C-alpha cells in the first residue's frame, strides 16, 4: 500500500486531549493534527519525533491533517493510525501474503458473532472448510526489539479472546492476528506487565484452539505492507 498523495513531514511538539497533536512544519508553521489513536502511544509521541501526516480534501473537517506515522529519534517507523491495521491485514490476506490465511474464496468484514455480540474484523469462508474468524490487533509498543500488546488494560480485548475461544469450541477456526506496526520490533509477547488478565486469557485461548499470528509491516514514508511472520512467546 502506497500513501497517495504523499505524506508530509513535521516535528512533534505535543499530543494532548488524546485526539490532537501540535506539530511544526519544516517552514516554521504550527499545525494541529487529528490523532487517530486512543491508546497510550507509549514511545510513539515523544517531543521532537518526526511526524508524517496526510491532508484531507474535505473542506468541512475541523482538523484536515491526520497523523499517520511517527519516525522516532532512533529512526524507527511506527504507524500510529490504528485504522491501518485492518486495512493492511485485509490487503495481505487478499494478496495471499499470509500463508496461514490463504486459500479462502470469500472475505467479509465486521460480521456480528458470539454471545457478547461482538463484531469480528474478518471472516474467511471457502467450500469444505470451517469458517475462519480473525480478530486484528495493532502492535506499536516496543521495548528494545520486543513488541507488546496491549499498551493499556483492555477489557474489550479480553472480551474478544473469550469470544474467539467460543468460536474454536464450536469447531470453527479462530485467529488472533497481531499486526506489528513498528519497524524496530523483531519478536512479540503479550504485555503481562501491563494487563496480566489479557496475557492469561491469550495463553488459555491458545490451549483451547485459538491460533496466534504476528506479522510485521515494512514501513516507510512512502507506504506500508505486512510482510514477515514474527515469533510469539506467551
From Swiss-Prot:
Binds to DNA non-specifically. Could be a regulatory factor involved in maltose metabolism. Keywords: DNA-binding. Pfam families: SfsA (PF03749), SfsA_N (PF17746). GO terms for molecular function: DNA binding. It comes from the Bacteria. InterPro entries: SfsA, SfsA_C, SfsA_N. Residues 201-220 bind DNA. This is Sugar fermentation stimulation protein A. Belongs to the SfsA family.
Amino acid at each position: 500500500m502506497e500513501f497517495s498523495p504523499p505524506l508530509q513531514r513535521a516535528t512533534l511538539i505535543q499530543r494532548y486531549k488524546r485526539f490532537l497533536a501540535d506539530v511544526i512544519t519544516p517552514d516554521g508553521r504550527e499545525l494541529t493534527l487529528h490523532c487517530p489513536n486512543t491508546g497510550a502511544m507509549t514511545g510513539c509521541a515523544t517531543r521532537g519525533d518526526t511526524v508524517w501526516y496526510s491532508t484531507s480534501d474535505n473542506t468541512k473537517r475541523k482538523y484536515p491533517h491526520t497523523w499517520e506515522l511517527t519516525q522516532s529519534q532512533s529512526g524507527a517507523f511506527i504507524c500510529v493510525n490504528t485504522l491501518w491495521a485492518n486495512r493492511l491485514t485485509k490487503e495481505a490476506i487478499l494478496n495471499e501474503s499470509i500463508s496461514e490465511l490463504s486459500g479462502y474464496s470469500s472475505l467479509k468484514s465486521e460480521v456480528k458473532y458470539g454471545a457478547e455480540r461482538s463484531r469480528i474484523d474478518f471472516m474467511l469462508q471457502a467450500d469444505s472448510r470451517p469458517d475462519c474468524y480473525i480478530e486484528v490487533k495493532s502492535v506499536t509498543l516496543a521495548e528494545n526489539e520486543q513488541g507488546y500488546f496491549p499498551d493499556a488494560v483492555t477489557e474489550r480485548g479480553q472480551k474478544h479472546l473469550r469470544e474467539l475461544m467460543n468460536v474454536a469450541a464450536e469447531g470453527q477456526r479462530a485467529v488472533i492476528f497481531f499486526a506489528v506496526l513498528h519497524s524496530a520490533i523483531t519478536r512479540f509477547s503479550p504485555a503481562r506487565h501491563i494487563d496480566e488478565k489479557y496475557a492469561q486469557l491469550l495463553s488459555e485461548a491458545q490451549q483451547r484452539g485459538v491460533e496466534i499470528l504476528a506479522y510485521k509491516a515494512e514501513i516507510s514514508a512512502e507506504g506500508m505492507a505486512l510482510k514477515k511472520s514474527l515469533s510469539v512467546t506467551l
